[in-house]
Amino acid sequence: MAALCNNLRAKLVSWQPVGLFHTGVRLLAADKDLLVKLRKKTGYSFMNCKKALEQCANDFKQAETWLHQQAQKEGWDKASKLQGRKTKEGLVGLLQDGSTSVMVEVNCETDFVARNSKFQQLVQQVAVSTLRHCQSHPENTSSYVKGFLCGDELLQLKADESLKDQLALAIGKLGENMIMKRAAWVKTPSDIFVGSYMHGILMADLPSLTNMTFGKYGALVICKDSDGNLKSNISEIGRRLGQHVVGMNPLLVGSLEDESGGETETKMLAQPFLLEPSLTVGQYLQPRGINVLDFIRFECGEEAESTESTPT
């Protein structure tokens, strides 16, 4: 018995603690300053930004890329789940730059999301991509060029990334089904101008969105100043004509010889002018030397008729 106790005592004296090692990757804690910076730049949650910095050992650029990739994957997953849900809300967006004007429509499920700056940024991305697409077309010095893009065509365009990927990111962030419905663009020579009007204007909160106009109804009116004497008033006349197109919803321009059919008239020049009902649009324009060549009208959520898609 004594020998057994001595043997046990010897083993206890000689025993050394053995360390237990975790074989997984040890994550570095997220740097607080980088966390705040990443959150502010990307708009993702603190938890996701923290996870990104931990995964990327506090490498800011890698963390930003990781966040983007994860959000895109989640966005596509969410987009497939939400596909088919009705998108009757949204915004019409208007962007003009020199001789180029574009108007786009992007739809979502609720007006609440339409008022979110992230959704407005998506509308801006669609407009900018359409603008670049339009500007890539050769100049026509004798007349204007007009084109339309449907939703499938828009998804193939790129801003910094493809609009298809941008759509997935927005769906992932905002949690609603969204569609890029349509876009129209106009490119004009120096003697033709485009009047514009937006109804139901939604004021943007972000300074980066100040070049955009958002609303529920939009119009572009393509005009020619025959006399060349209205340089200072062109913008206001164009705005009034756009307001008429939104309010009276003409179907075609018509001609000065058309007789007015009253309130049911669908030819623009023969309609009572919205802002001066005692005159037709043609009678309002004739003494001012303005010729209306064409117009485009968007109403958010309307059933869009098939429109020409060329030139694209």
UniProtKB/Swiss-Prot annotation:
It is found in: Mitochondrion. InterPro entries: EF-Ts_dimer_sf, Transl_elong_EFTs/EF1B, Transl_elong_EFTs/EF1B_dimer, Transl_elong_Ts_CS, UBA-like_sf. Its main location: mitochondrion. GO terms for molecular function: translation elongation factor activity. The keyword Glycoprotein does not apply. One of its GO terms (cellular component) is mitochondrion. Keywords: Elongation factor, Mitochondrion, Protein biosynthesis. PANTHER family: ELONGATION FACTOR TS, ELONGATION FACTOR TS, MITOCHONDRIAL. This protein may be expected to contain an N-terminal transit peptide but none has been predicted. Belongs to the EF-Ts family. This is Elongation factor Ts, mitochondrial. It comes from Xenopus laevis.
